[in-house]
């Protein structure tokens, strides 16, 4: 932490009135980060915490001290409850021994004076403060779900819609601060607190300062190493642009799993920051990479303003959920963008097919409404998929789920856990071997993905099954498939709803999606080879063709999860493939570099081992599945 700008004479601690009403909304604890993020100027470890009861010596009001929420260089933060009103707070406890010197006390006064008058939905609310002979107590809004650092520690990476959700709130709070002439100077995951209803609040104003003209700015280096801007390290002063830089580091950390300039050595980290030396993973969407590249620029003048950031394609063309589920604190949420056309169509189809007809209901009125919504469905079919299919896109797609799972299949979580358990059991006990055991002589034909196209930067993920059925998992979570004979269209508005239409009777609201599906089919037919020599299976022989529930791309492979429990992993480098199917017993099909395919019983692999080539891919598949598991 940094001493307050300037040295003022010590003065008595002002005392704020104790509120008679609870603070608006739940609110945050103190500085708590899952990684070791030492502040550049930090004091020694705080002494032992105070007793269980905190008493205001002037008013006599008492508070029960609860659990520790977080700790920093100068203070600890606890949950505290007013014994009379029952209102819960986060109380920041600063030992008097830490503010014995005038400049130390001035620092705390500066924090209080900057924070106490801030009133904004995305700023931690300051309630009141007092002191006794042992400590200074600052009472703040309590955020029951801790900080974004805790979510990041549990999740490691977040989806782009989640990152947009949190960044919009951070930008809102930061814009308010800058408009009031306040610089935060320590924006990091541990200082973004999450309320009970999943709202974000910017907190911890221990390093905050008033904005000064460039020539009058203090040159002190302050902040957290991984998030410090290059001009701060070069002692050029701290302006609003340095907060924007820190925000870019936060965005990168949430999307990529680690800060952009993090190294094992602090000096090396600072060198990377000064030289703006970092990498942008290809797995990020193009707008995300463009925004990060715009923010993380060496010159403060070249960085975008908050308004420009909010107008960037990353925010304007990407889906931002209105609210995140609480489960997203620990596991990947199932996010489905709203689609007015789909919602109305689901309502109409339910009216037409899903229940008894109401004699008093005018069905033609609803049908007219559906036809009017055709332009709402996303976009026109691409003029040339060849030119755009290689564009980078979102690394993940998921079919919408109503919570009950696919009616005749499994949920994503069930598929992941079943495959994870079976594969872990196989790999863990597999003895060393140099070659594969004998494959099954006549394995049952299986349905697998023979071709695929990732066009999710605009439309969705297209694939062709070995049965010649072609399908698209659209970005809005809907799924549409074309039968092998190209005469029937299958539409899944959610994972629990399924409708079939003849080609000539597809509703107008679905025509744009059908157009995109047909373009995908045409492109794959004309430009892609079948991915392996496996026995084909006729679609008529498949009672319920599997539905793609989720796909995930990494820098090495593509993972696909299906409603019948099938798991397929395609490796980019050598075009090998791994398919897990059957389950009773589990079958492992390996498509080699020469496109030849062999199917093995997983139990045989466990007993006899397999070649290093196959073992390596089984282990990578296991790692991919672990990454998708909420456990």
Swiss-Prot record:
<dbReference type="GO" id="GO:0043066">
    <property type="term" value="P:negative regulation of apoptotic process"/>
</dbReference>
<dbReference type="InterPro" id="IPR008271">
    <property type="entry name" value="Ser/Thr_kinase_AS"/>
</dbReference>
<dbReference type="GO" id="GO:0000785">
    <property type="term" value="C:chromatin"/>
</dbReference>
<dbReference type="GO" id="GO:0000082">
    <property type="term" value="P:G1/S transition of mitotic cell cycle"/>
</dbReference>
<dbReference type="GO" id="GO:0051302">
    <property type="term" value="P:regulation of cell division"/>
</dbReference>
<feature type="domain" description="Protein kinase">
    <location>
        <begin position="63"/>
        <end position="315"/>
    </location>
</feature>
<comment type="function">
    <text>Serine/threonine-protein kinase involved in cell cycle regulation, response to stress and Golgi disassembly. Polo-like kinases act by binding and phosphorylating proteins that are already phosphorylated on a specific motif recognized by the POLO box domains. Phosphorylates ATF2, BCL2L1, CDC25A, CDC25C, CHEK2, HIF1A, JUN, p53/TP53, p73/TP73, PTEN, TOP2A and VRK1. Involved in cell cycle regulation: required for entry into S phase and cytokinesis. Phosphorylates BCL2L1, leading to regulate the G2 checkpoint and progression to cytokinesis during mitosis.</text>
</comment>
<dbReference type="Pfam" id="PF00659">
    <property type="entry name" value="POLO_box"/>
</dbReference>
<keyword id="KW-0547">Nucleotide-binding</keyword>
<dbReference type="GO" id="GO:0006915">
    <property type="term" value="P:apoptotic process"/>
</dbReference>
<keyword id="KW-0677">Repeat</keyword>
<keyword id="KW-0963">Cytoplasm</keyword>
<dbReference type="GO" id="GO:0005634">
    <property type="term" value="C:nucleus"/>
</dbReference>
<feature type="binding site">
    <location>
        <position position="92"/>
    </location>
    <ligand>
        <name>ATP</name>
    </ligand>
</feature>
<dbReference type="GO" id="GO:0044819">
    <property type="term" value="P:mitotic G1/S transition checkpoint signaling"/>
</dbReference>
<protein>
    <recommendedName>
        <fullName>Serine/threonine-protein kinase PLK3</fullName>
        <ecNumber>2.7.11.21</ecNumber>
    </recommendedName>
</protein>
<dbReference type="InterPro" id="IPR036947">
    <property type="entry name" value="POLO_box_dom_sf"/>
</dbReference>
<dbReference type="GO" id="GO:0090316">
    <property type="term" value="P:positive regulation of intracellular protein transport"/>
</dbReference>
<dbReference type="GO" id="GO:0031122">
    <property type="term" value="P:cytoplasmic microtubule organization"/>
</dbReference>
<keyword id="KW-0723">Serine/threonine-protein kinase</keyword>
<dbReference type="GO" id="GO:0004674">
    <property type="term" value="F:protein serine/threonine kinase activity"/>
</dbReference>
<dbReference type="InterPro" id="IPR042703">
    <property type="entry name" value="PLK3_STKc"/>
</dbReference>
<dbReference type="InterPro" id="IPR011009">
    <property type="entry name" value="Kinase-like_dom_sf"/>
</dbReference>
<dbReference type="GO" id="GO:0051898">
    <property type="term" value="P:negative regulation of phosphatidylinositol 3-kinase/protein kinase B signal transduction"/>
</dbReference>
<keyword id="KW-0333">Golgi apparatus</keyword>
<dbReference type="Pfam" id="PF00069">
    <property type="entry name" value="Pkinase"/>
</dbReference>
<feature type="compositionally biased region" description="Pro residues">
    <location>
        <begin position="20"/>
        <end position="31"/>
    </location>
</feature>
<dbReference type="GO" id="GO:0006970">
    <property type="term" value="P:response to osmotic stress"/>
</dbReference>
<dbReference type="GO" id="GO:0000302">
    <property type="term" value="P:response to reactive oxygen species"/>
</dbReference>
<dbReference type="GO" id="GO:0005730">
    <property type="term" value="C:nucleolus"/>
</dbReference>
<keyword id="KW-0067">ATP-binding</keyword>
<keyword id="KW-0539">Nucleus</keyword>
<dbReference type="GO" id="GO:0002039">
    <property type="term" value="F:p53 binding"/>
</dbReference>
<dbReference type="GO" id="GO:0005813">
    <property type="term" value="C:centrosome"/>
</dbReference>
<feature type="active site" description="Proton acceptor">
    <location>
        <position position="186"/>
    </location>
</feature>
<keyword id="KW-0053">Apoptosis</keyword>
<feature type="domain" description="POLO box 1">
    <location>
        <begin position="448"/>
        <end position="526"/>
    </location>
</feature>
<dbReference type="GO" id="GO:0106310">
    <property type="term" value="F:protein serine kinase activity"/>
</dbReference>
<dbReference type="GO" id="GO:0032436">
    <property type="term" value="P:positive regulation of proteasomal ubiquitin-dependent protein catabolic process"/>
</dbReference>
<keyword id="KW-0597">Phosphoprotein</keyword>
<keyword id="KW-0418">Kinase</keyword>
<dbReference type="GO" id="GO:0000122">
    <property type="term" value="P:negative regulation of transcription by RNA polymerase II"/>
</dbReference>
